[in-house]
Amino acid sequence: MIRRLLLIGLALLIAAPAAAAPSKIRVSLKTSEGVIVIALDMKHAPITAGNFLAYVDQKKLDGTSFYRAARAVGNPKRGFIQGGVHRDARRSLPPIAHEPTSKTGLRHLDGTISMARREPGTAMGEFFILVGAAPSMDAQPGGKGDTAGYAAFGQVVSGMPVVRRILAARTWPQGSGAMKGQLIKQQIRIIEAKRAG
């Protein structure tokens, strides 16, 4: 009888499908301005979302900051904030393969989180969050120049008022290139990054 029950139990275990990995994983960024909760899209952008999650799980984002507020010309309530390890080699993981929006199907919408990069395949621990849609950041196959766009990998699900406050932070007028006038005077600390229930 017991042997029969054990065999039935074993057969059920073998027949049961493996639990699927969640398609969305939530991450909480506790900042000096408040909490931002992000849903990472593990299904559509597994490499990029997995990379961000590695930074979270290894505590590499704890103690970093949001250091850039890039406000749109003519509409300072739109733009993006950028944060992360800011070229700190001790915190950086190896670069990842680029996942363009033309492959993932994701778009750069209000609240989208995406990876900052130089060339495709150089993204590591720098990311940005949009305030307002920015379709120009999506991949533009068939265009001229760098048409790969940026790798969107999730969406803010709570804390957009915090993101907007960071975007409105005072910036230095100095800087060079694209960063001119965008570096935050008093950087917004990322106190803790962790998985959220």
Please provide the spans of the model-predicted regions.
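Bacterial N-terminal signal peptides that target proteins for export
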Residues: 1-6
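Bacterial N-terminal signal peptides
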Residues: 7-15
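Cyclophilin-like peptidyl-prolyl cis-trans isomerases
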Residues: 18-197
